[in-house]
Amino acid sequence: MVVPYKDQSKSKKEQVANMFNTISPQYDFLNHLLSGGIDIIWRKKAIKLLQNKGIKTMLDIATGTGDFAIEALKINPEKIVGVDISEGMLSFGQEKIKKMGLEKTIQLQKGDSEKLPFSDNSFDAVIVSFGVRNFENLQKGLSDMFRVTKPGGYCLVLEFSNPRTFPMKQLY
């Protein structure tokens, strides 16, 4: 298991929440900078895959500051719920959503990817961008994603892999 801080006695989940609480004020800038903007491009492409699928309800897991949820509005769902374990990230996300006047469509709440606080078959689509690497138990997180997805619904995961070749390996 990869943990943010190897010398701590806290669980990976607690370490991840603490790390994101700490970096939340700079997260959007750092994410776009360190990914070379690829995060923005991938989110746009991913949401295009969900066009014309009749999606009315969406869940954005590890929503952070809400970038993927905001991008998902392009397919006109009635409701998007974003969950994250970091109160700091949620606070910045709420602020961003309020400034954009989107609080009627996007709702953010604290939530654990492995114990999602929703009934089975609740959402037409469940999305996560650059968050599964932070799941404490990947199998539990993915299983819970599928649990809350309606039959015939969609699960969409965006994630980076570890680069294996020069020069990206050295930069990563």
Which residues does each PLM region occupy?
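Hydrophobic beta-strand segment of the Class I
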Residues: 27, 126-127
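Conserved alpha-helix/loop element of class I SAM-dependent methyltransferases that forms part
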Residues: 26, 36-56, 71
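N-terminal auxiliary segments of SAM/dcSAM-dependent transferases
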Residues: 1-17
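A short acidic, Gly/Pro-enriched loop at the edge of an enzyme's catalytic core
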Residues: 114-125
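Short catalytic micro-motifs in class I SAM-dependent methyltransferases
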Residues: 130-131
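Conserved class I S-adenosyl-L-methionine
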Residues: 154-172
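A short glycine-rich, Lys/Arg-flanked "PGG" loop and its adjoining helix->strand segment in the class I
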Residues: 139-151
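Class I SAM-dependent methyltransferase SAM/SAH-binding core
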Residues: 57-115
